[in-house]
Amino acid sequence: MASLRKTHPLIKIANDALVDLPTPSNISAWWNFGSLLGLCLITQILTGLFLAMHYTSDISTAFSSVTHICRDVNYGWLIRNIHANGASFFFICIYMHIARGLYYGSYLYKETWNIGVVLLLLVMMTAFVGYVLPWGQMSFWGATVITNLLSAVPYMGDMLVQWIWGGFSVDNATLTRFFAFHFLLPFIIAAATVIHLLFLHETGSNNPIGLNSDADKISFHPYFSYKDLLGFVIMLLALTLLALFSPNLLGDPENFTPANPLVTPPHIKPEWYFLFAYAILRSIPNKLGGVLALLFSILVLMVVPLLHTSKQRGLTFRPITQFLFWTLVADMIILTWIGGMPVEHPFIIIGQIASVLYFALFLVLFPLAGWLENKALKWA
């Protein structure tokens, strides 16, 4: 008789996804980030739940409630530090996961890839509304600046901004709804993750050489379950070290000051993981143009599968595109640096060049290099 895990309607689903899943035998550590993202999501939902038990979403008490969590709640300081720094690890894993997808041509699984881009947008949205909740100076002014961007929408912009604010400025109504969104979105992310996996398991995983691996598959458990476990240990160790030794390393000192609508901070900037997009936004002098560039800096990922010209899937055997890939990585680092710098010479021009290069790589240089490599191999 077949075992329960293969027959039980519910356990069978988990078995097919986590135990008996046929997996390419040669996938490297770059394939660990999917499960690490799952771990990040679970960690964030759990720590967030415990924070929500003590947090109050009212402008008169929000800041003090966070102080109360850190001072008076049992291990509240730890829960808060893990939650705040867990967001940074979430984005590190997301960017690594996307980079892996770009490098090895995983984007050719179009449904999985597009759901992934939607997931990225959802996570970015969640992080943004979450950053507003402590109601510090950078929370308030970050919310003001970013929500104000919607006023660039023609005809209905101003109405849209006031609708999101729930008034004529970022105020109590804004904080309350942002808390509601911040609580709800992670569960939508969890649901979208299930769809992401559903589409992935329709095709199976890609692998480093980009060839069909049906002839050489091994079961997920115990091989990759233990490999994932090693990744979990490394990431949790790194997160714990950051949360215990330098919890404020990645935060903004402005956020230790309660929100004050009458005092604007000298430099308004988002958390480090949004700086690249912020740099692209700022590099265009026109408001609507900047907003569109900001939006397209993420949505450009959706056109990557359509612009794939190479006869090979990944970049393992494609040196020209490899060079362009690492140029993209360097470009992202430069944009991140520029996003945190004041708007003055030479940062303005560096940001503009880096922004043009960012879009040129995705829309022109990658497809061109793929075509060129086909020609070089006489495959075209």
Curated annotation (Swiss-Prot):
Keywords: Electron transport, Heme, Iron, Membrane, Metal-binding, Mitochondrion, Mitochondrion inner membrane, Respiratory chain, Transmembrane, Transmembrane helix, Transport, Ubiquinone
Gene Ontology cellular component list: mitochondrial inner membrane; respiratory chain complex III
Entry superkingdom: Eukaryota
Co-factor note (free text): Binds 2 heme b groups non-covalently.
Localisation per UniProt entry: Mitochondrion inner membrane
Disulfide topology: none
The protein's required cofactors: heme b
Record-level Gene Ontology MF annotations: metal ion binding; ubiquinol-cytochrome-c reductase activity
Membrane topology field: Multi-pass membrane protein
Residues the record lists as binding heme b b562: 83, 182
Main location: mitochondrion
Amino-acid positions noted as binding a ubiquinone in the UniProt annotation, renumbered to this chain: 201
Segments passing through the bilayer: 33-53, 77-98, 113-133, 178-198, 226-246, 288-308, 320-340, 347-367
Task performed by this protein: Component of the ubiquinol-cytochrome c reductase complex (complex III or cytochrome b-c1 complex) that is part of the mitochondrial respiratory chain. The b-c1 complex mediates electron transfer from ubiquinol to cytochrome c. Contributes to the generation of a proton gradient across the mitochondrial membrane that is then used for ATP synthesis.
Quaternary data: The cytochrome bc1 complex contains 3 respiratory subunits (MT-CYB, CYC1 and UQCRFS1), 2 core proteins (UQCRC1 and UQCRC2) and probably 6 low-molecular weight proteins.
Further comment: Heme 1 (or BL or b562) is low-potential and absorbs at about 562 nm, and heme 2 (or BH or b566) is high-potential and absorbs at about 566 nm.
Protein name: Cytochrome b
Native organism: Carassius auratus
